[in-house]
Amino acid sequence: MLDPNILRNELGAVAEKLARRGYTLDVDTLRKQEERRKVLQVETETLQAERNSRSKAIGAAKARGEDIDPLRQEVNQLGEKLDTAKAELEKLQAEIRDLALSIPNIPDDSVPVGKDENDNLEVSRWGEPGKYDFEIQDHVSLGELTNGLDFAAAVKLTGSRFVVMKGQIARLHRALAQFMLNLHTEQHGYLETYVPYLVNHETLYGTGQLPKFGEDLFHTKPLEEEAESHYALIPTAEVPITNLVRGDILDENELPLKMTAHTPCFRSEAGSYGRDTRGLIRMHQFDKVELVQIVHPDESMDALEALTGHAEKVLQLLNLPYRKVLLCTGDMGFSACKTYDLEVWLPAQNTYREISSCSNMWDFQARRMQARFRGKEDKKTQLLHTLNGSGLAVGRTLVAVMENYQQADGRIEIPEVLRPYMGGLEYIG
């Protein structure tokens, strides 16, 4: 959520910056709402002052033995007018808030201007794609050869975009998640957390999934139904972890907070019909190890570089070729002000595919959550800055390992760093 003060005082500049990401800010509506809000605010305060004055006059008149009925009638009339003005002001403020909640974050000035993924900027590459003297197979075929991936069984149980993993492939999937968690907690200083997989609406508003992206979620009840027990499955552990500081005021010396969690993630993929229908790339349910940092505003851009480096380290230790991409304004997520994507090399597709997205949200989520800290010198409260990234998507990492480590006979070599998690096993198949 953007700062209401800049929406009031710098509306033109905000509209120009949001236009870089392809968002058209409804300037006329915002201006009209703000003008009407000011009028109603003054009217409400004036009526309140008049009613208070008349109420005091009743006491004085009563002490003098005067007839107070006319004053009482006047106070009652002022009260009715005040109630009407307050109700209109509250309704307008709710409309202003609803509109504000639908406005995306302002891109950082360092973000390249562009329309879509074709305008993203490649920052660096690590590792060289392997050369194979045999016909490359994709992870689906390799999963069939090793009897480790069963999509037909998942269709029977649930439907498309699900999978049943078996045997050593299931074990490899588990090993990847354990390896990632150990790396981030033991070497990168993150606190491991276990969080609910169901969250309430307030939590989803806090990180920006609601109100705009409700159709991307799996809900326990129809979204239109208002209910206290209305939950949604988490689309990412970013949602519950970041909301751990919702409504809190931290001490500055508690910062930064660095947390990680391994969870399943659930997404409806509402806008992805026909895309990546084969294999594990785009699933309704997938596992991810999430990285979240809650930091001082002065540190957030440095924290983004560090967090992205933590995700990169996973790929480097697995010896998987990848590239780092700075997303353009038109390809960034709703809540982000700057995002790096890490894209891993998939031999069967002969291209790089996203395996991690690391973002600085600035104070956008913190304002929605009212998450603040108290300065150690001036004791004033400020909004925190929040960051998150995949460290990594476990299913896509499994795909990358299977395809990059495949052998001519269909076996899959286990990366050295994963062998301790696999009982010393060197090959699958």
From Swiss-Prot:
Pathway given in the UniProt record: Aminoacyl-tRNA biosynthesis; selenocysteinyl-tRNA(Sec) biosynthesis; L-seryl-tRNA(Sec) from L-serine and tRNA(Sec): step 1/1
Family: Belongs to the class-II aminoacyl-tRNA synthetase family. Type-1 seryl-tRNA synthetase subfamily.
Record protein name field: Serine--tRNA ligase
The keyword Aminoacyl-tRNA synthetase is assigned to this record: yes
UniProt subcellular location: Cytoplasm
MF annotations from Gene Ontology: ATP binding; serine-tRNA ligase activity
EC number: 6.1.1.11
Biological function: Catalyzes the attachment of serine to tRNA(Ser). Is also able to aminoacylate tRNA(Sec) with serine, to form the misacylated tRNA L-seryl-tRNA(Sec), which will be further converted into selenocysteinyl-tRNA(Sec).
Residues reported to bind ATP: R267, S268, E269, E354, I355, S356, S357
Chemical reaction(s) catalysed: tRNA(Ser) + L-serine + ATP = L-seryl-tRNA(Ser) + AMP + diphosphate + H(+); tRNA(Sec) + L-serine + ATP = L-seryl-tRNA(Sec) + AMP + diphosphate + H(+)
A Gene Ontology biological process term: selenocysteine biosynthetic process
PROSITE patterns: AA_TRNA_LIGASE_II
Gene Ontology cellular component annotations, sorted alphabetically: cytoplasm
Binding site for L-serine: T236, A237, E238, E290, S390
Originating organism: Photorhabdus laumondii subsp. laumondii (strain DSM 15139 / CIP 105565 / TT01)
Superkingdom of origin organism: Bacteria
Keyword ATP-binding: yes
